A protein has these predicted regions:
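Solvent-exposed, polar/charged alpha-helical surfaces in well-ordered, non-transmembrane soluble domains
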Residues: 1, 5, 49, 67-71, ...
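Acidic, polar ligand-binding/catalytic clefts
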Residues: 1-51, 121-128, 139
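A ligand-binding cleft/hinge motif common to bilobed small-molecule-binding domains
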Residues: 4, 12-23, 68-71, 96-130
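Bilobed "Venus flytrap"/periplasmic-binding protein-like clamshell domains
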Residues: 15, 33-90, 107-109
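Periplasmic-binding protein-like
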Residues: 20, 31-39, 107, 111-154, ...
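Short active-site oxyanion
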Residues: 54-56, 100-101, 152
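Solvent-exposed, acidic/flexible segments
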Residues: 58-63, 84-88, 103, 138, ...
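Ligand-binding clefts/hinges and TM-proximal coupling segments of bilobed small-molecule sensing domains
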Residues: 64-85, 118, 122-124, 153-182
Length: 182
């Protein structure tokens, strides 16, 4: 609503065009993040194939992970229960408390979970998907900002700025050579 009302100019925080292509006017993708799943080592869950109707998986509400699971786009039993939470912290808490069997998210918080509790959790060896991130503007936007932002993002990709930022904050994220094209 804030975007539609003009209270803000854009949405730019781990935001993906996936399943939203026609809802917003997008910049070119500037970053690709890897999505995987974490499970307790004692669970026996090592891949999506190990999930059956008795298992539950935590996802962030509104995320690409949630949308793909609900759409049946991933090779997973349709009987797996999907529990949607409002944040990564809530997913992590639900997983730690045993309310869910595993947690699907960007690898960054999953890797932090494994590092914080060595020997307790594992992240699937096979990544589930990659997700392109972009900046979303109101669908009716016609100004020069998107073109200027694409140009700036392309330059930041080309000169290594995005990779340096990613290196500081997001294990498992890369530009994948996708930096916005001018």
């Amino acid at each position: 609503r804030l975007l539609e009302n003009g209270d803000i100019d854009c949405l730019w925080c781990d935001y993906s065009p996936c399943y939203r292509e026609d809802k917003y006017y997008w910049t070119e993708p500037y970053l690709t993040v890897t999505v995987s799943v974490a499970a307790k080592k004692t669970s026996g869950i090592k891949s999506l194939a190990h999930l059956d109707g008795s298992k539950t998986i935590a996802v962030i509400a509104g995320s690409v992970s949630e949308r793909r699971l609900l759409a049946g786009d991933l090779e997973i039993s349709p009987d797996v229960q999907i529990k949607s939470y409002g944040s990564a912290e809530l997913c992590k808490a639900a997983h730690a408390k045993g309310y869910v069997d595993c947690w699907m998210a960007d690898v960054q918080p999953l890797d932090r979970l494994v590092a914080r509790y060595p020997g307790l959790y594992r992240v699937f060896a096979d990544n589930v998907m990659t997700v392109d991130l972009g900046v979303a503007f109101d669908d009716g936007y016609e100004g020069p900002i998107v073109k200027d932002l694409n140009t700036a993002l392309f330059a930041m990709d080309r000169d290594g700025t995005i990779d340096r930022i990613v290196g500081n904050y997001k294990t498992g994220a890369t530009t994948g050579g996708q930096g916005a094209n001018p």
